[in-house]
Amino acid sequence: MLTSSPDTIVAIATAPGRGGVGVVRLSGPQALSIASSIVGERLLSPRLAHFCRFRNQDGDVLDEGLVISFPAPHSFTGEDVVELQGHGGPVILDMLVATCIEAGARQARAGEFSQRAFLNDKMDLTQAEAIADLIDAGTAASARAALHSLQGVFSAEVNQLVEALIGLRIYVEAAIDFPEEEIDFLSDGKVASDLRAVRKQCLRVLGEANQGRLVREGMTLVIAGKPNAGKSSLMNALAGFDAAIVTDIAGTTRDVLRESIQLDGMPLNLIDTAGLRDSADVVEQEGIRRAYAEMRKADRLLVMVDSRDPLDDIHNLHDLLPQSQQQLENLDLPVTVVLNKADLSGLSTGPRADGAFVISAANGEGLDALRGHLKQVAGYQGEGQSRFSARRRHITALEKALMALESGEQQLHGQAAGELLAEDLRAAQKALEEITGVFTADDLLGRIFSSFCIGK
C-alpha cells in the first residue's frame, strides 16, 4: 500500500563537484507545486522534458534547463517526484536546493528517497541496498551482481524459500490446531521431505550469497612481520605498481598503507603495516600500534618472514613474532605465513607441506600460488558464480534460517515434535523476511538507509 509522507524533500541527485549537468530531485505532496513556482508554469505533461528558466522566490533567474515530473504513484518513490536538470555547478545546484526549501521543502536525509520507495512498496530492502551497491561498485563483477539484485534476483530466491516455509507451516500448524483431523505428518514423510528440500535450497542460496558478498566486499588482508621482511615489496608486487616505498633501511614503513586490487573479480583490500619490533622511536611506536589495530579488524593476517631466518614452528605466531606476544594473545584470526626472499635463500617457491608459501616478492616467483591460495581461503569461486550482491547481514540472516531448519529436522522425531517444529519454522521465516524487509526493526532500516547518498 502506498503511503504519502507529509513533507516534501529535496536534494542534489548527482555526484558532488562540477559537471555538465546537475540534477535536483523533489519528492512529496508539494513537489509539483514547488517546482511550478520555480519554473513559473504548471507541469502539464508527466515524464516529458520541458525547457524552462529556474527562478528564485524573488523572480531572479538562477539557471535554465529541463524539468521532468513523475506524478504518484508512477515514480521512483511512489510519491510526486520532480527533477530539475540544470548545469552542474555546485553553487547553482545549492541555490536551487535553497529555493526549494524556501518554497516549502526540506533537505532530504541520506537515503531518504530510497527509504520512501521501500516504504511505498516500490522495491524491497535487498533492491534498495542494491542501489547503493551499484553506485559503490568497484569492479565490473560487483556492478553486475548489484544490478541483478536490483532486478530482484536475490529477492526471488528468498521469497521462494519463504513460500515453501509458509506451506510447511500451514501443514504442521493444522496438525497442531486440529488434532481431531488426525494429520500424522511424521508417518507420511511429507514434512520430512519438504523440510529437507527447503534446507538444501537455503544452503544453496547461502553459498551464492557468500559469493555475492565476496564480490561486493572482498577480503581485507593485513601484511605484518618484522622490519625488512619484504611486506611493502609484496604489496607492490600484488598491486602491480609501487604503492609503498621500499628501501633496505629497517623501519621505512611507519604508517598504515592501503591499496585495493582485484583477484579475478574479487576485491582484495591490502594493508601494509610498520615492521613489528621494540622501538624507542615515538613515530615508529605509533605505526606499530596502528598495525595491531588493523589486525583486529582484518579478515586474514599474512605474516611475512625472511626465508633466511631459522624457524621452529611456522604455526606459532609467538615464534614468528616473539616481540608481539602480548598484543597477539587474544587475536583470533586466520593466518597465512609467507617466506619471502627465495631469490636470496635459494628455497623453491610455491606452497610447502606445512602450509607456508615461499615467494620472491622481488622477482614475482611464487605469487601466482599465493593469489590462488587467497582466493581459496576466502571461498571465492570466480566472478561467474555471483548471481547477485549480498551483505553480511544477509549472510547472518540466512545462517539463522539454516540453523532453525536444521533444528526443525532434529525435532521431527522428538517429544512434542509439532510445537517445536512449528516454532523453528517460524524462526526460519522471520530470519528470511529480515532480508527483504518484510520483518525489519526500524533501527536497522535507519542504519541501512543512512549509508546511502543524500540524493538517493
Curated annotation (Swiss-Prot):
GTP binds at residues 228-233, 247-253, 272-275, 340-343. The keyword tRNA processing applies. Its main location: cytoplasm. Disulfide bonds: none annotated. (6S)-5-formyl-5,6,7,8-tetrahydrofolate binds at residues 25, 83, 122, 456. Keywords: Cytoplasm, GTP-binding, Hydrolase, Magnesium, Metal-binding, Nucleotide-binding, Potassium, tRNA processing. The keyword Cytoplasm applies. Its EC number is 3.6.-.-. Belongs to the TRAFAC class TrmE-Era-EngA-EngB-Septin-like GTPase superfamily. TrmE GTPase family. This is tRNA modification GTPase MnmE. It comes from Alcanivorax borkumensis (strain ATCC 700651 / DSM 11573 / NCIMB 13689 / SK2). The gene is mnmE.
